[in-house]
Curated annotation (Swiss-Prot):
Residues 1-60, 390-454 are annotated as: Disordered. Residues 41-52, 434-448 have a biased composition (Low complexity). It comes from Mycolicibacterium smegmatis (strain ATCC 700084 / mc(2)155) (Mycobacterium smegmatis). GO terms for molecular function: DNA binding; RNA binding. Residues 397-433 have a biased composition (Basic and acidic residues). Monomer. Binds ribosomal protein S1 (RpsA), RNA, ssDNA and dsDNA. This is Uncharacterized protein MSMEG_2731/MSMEI_2664. Disruption phenotype: No visible phenotype. There are about 700 copies of the protein per cell during exponential growth.
């Protein structure tokens, strides 16, 4: 603002009103961090400030002695004394002061209309200007400025309320975001066992947390305590889990080392049936023992598997050798059957003798593959039946059939005894031999009786 020209005097020329001199300094409010609201539409209709063209002659007069008067709707008042020039200079000087005041009002209107200022500060500035108008040393339409300042105060109050509502809405939204993040962190802390993914998510929550501002300090502190407590709970659970995992791995290692020793002790066994069952039991124990550390677990498994492979390779080789032997036995019995089918039935005694020789060879050959045993036995029984039922030349057929039946039963029990012996069923083998001996005795007695009747 321009200073007064030389010769102007009066108490009003040294006042500190707007348009007259610098306002009294007031403490600047301490800035508080506040959320930055989203762009908002103008809350009041734009006020287009008129150009500073107020005619000072319409709103004042200058007395011959230099006294300057302001004319308002409520009357006249002295605003100063002018002795620095002619009357027009006084009008020009005090008119410029009004123009400066008008410019300040227009600036407040523009800031309020465009939303570029804090409505509370605009209201405070407008109130200060309105308070200074009754003593302002200006010539112009002060009543119009007063009306415009009243409008600014009203509109600024409404704008301040809107801003407050927006701040409250923004603060509530930001608080809700942190509420949701705190609740998610608490759920992770209480329930999650996906340790890596959960730990990563807690770090992501923290990164997002730091971007959320504008909360009330008390609410923000309370939510931070919830998140921090959840993170500590999760870290304790995770630490306990891995400590327990380490303990279980040590236990699993000890158990599997013992299983390896037991497996290695069985590796050279030739008791194929019992040892196969033992290895199945060991494998079940292995699966139930849990896992050691990966490298340790892999090494122990290779050790266990090596012992297992040693045994089963030997068993498979023995079975292959046995199968080859049984196959050769089947071929030998095929040859005996072919020989038996060629026996001459015209001489019954000779036929029976030949069949007995074949039966002895048959029993001496031993076992055949399981799938061939029934077939070969059935063919031999058919040949025995054919020889048994052949005409006997004067011998009682029923007595002869009975003697043959006794002999067949004896042979049947003898074969049962051999099978039981091979299977390790000693008691069954002894019982079968005893039955065979009894039937053999009866068969011999029947044969002697037939000889006497010839």
């Amino acid at each position: 603002m321009r200073g007064p020209p030389r010769g102007v005097r009066g108490a009003d020329m040294t006042t500190s009103e707007p348009g007259g001199a610098t306002p009294k300094p007031t403490p600047r409010p301490t800035p508080h961090p506040t959320p930055r609201p989203v762009p908002r539409p103008s809350r009041v209709a734009p006020v287009v400030a008129a150009a500073p063209s107020s005619d000072p002659h319409r709103f004042g007069r200058v007395d011959p002695d230099g006294t300057v008067w302001l004319i308002t709707g409520s009357g006249e008042r002295v605003i100063g004394a002018w002795q620095a020039g002619d009357t027009e200079s006084a009008f020009a000087h005090f008119g410029r002061r009004y123009d400066d005041l008008h410019t300040e009002v227009a600036l407040l209107e523009r800031r309020l209309a465009t939303g570029t200022g804090d409505a509370r500060k605009i209201k405070s500035a407008a109130a200060a200007l309105a308070e200074s108008l009754p003593t302002a040393s200006v010539l112009g339409d002060v009543d119009a400025l007063s009306a415009r300042l009243s409008s600014i105060l009203e509109q600024a109050d409404e704008a301040a309320q809107n801003e407050r509502a927006q701040r409250d809405e923004y603060r509530a939204a930001q608080t809700a975001r942190k509420e949701a993040l705190a609740a998610e962190a608490e759920d992770i802390a209480a329930n999650s066992t996906q340790w890596k993914a959960a730990g990563d998510r807690l770090r992501e929550i923290l990164d997002e947390w730091r971007t959320i501002t504008g909360l009330e300090r008390k609410a923000d502190d309370a939510l931070w305590k919830r998140y921090s407590a959840a993170r500590e709970t999760f870290n304790r659970r995770r630490g306990s889990h891995f400590a327990e995992l380490d303990r279980s791995r040590v236990s699993a290692r000890q158990a599997k080392e013992e299983l390896c020793e037991r497996a290695e002790a069985l590796a050279d066994s030739t008791d194929w049936g019992a040892t196969s069952a033992a290895f199945r039991d060991l494998l079940a124990e292995w699966k139930a023992a849990g896992r050691a550390a990966k490298d340790v677990d892999d090494a122990l498994w290779q050790r266990f598997k090596a012992a297992q492979d040693t045994f089963f390779s030997a068993r498979n080789a023995a079975h292959a050798e046995r199968d080859a032997e049984f196959k050769a036995n089947a071929a030998a019995k095929e040859a005996l059957l072919a020989e038996a089918e060629k026996i001459d039935l015209s001489d019954n005694e000779a036929a029976r003798a030949a069949l007995r020789v074949i039966g002895e060879k048959w029993d001496a050959i031993g076992k055949v593959p399981r799938e061939r045993a029934a077939e070969l036995e059935r063919r031999l029984r058919a040949i025995e039946k054919k020889i048994r039922e052949a005409p006997t030349g004067g011998v009682d057929p029923e007595a002869k059939a009975r003697a043959d039946q006794f002999r067949a039963r004896a042979e049947q029990f003898e074969r049962q005894a051999e099978k039981a012996e091979a299977a390790g069923r000693t008691k069954d083998a002894e019982e079968a031999r005893a039955s065979a001996a009894q039937w053999r005795q009866w068969a011999e007695a029947a044969a002697e009786s037939l000889e006497k009747r010839r």
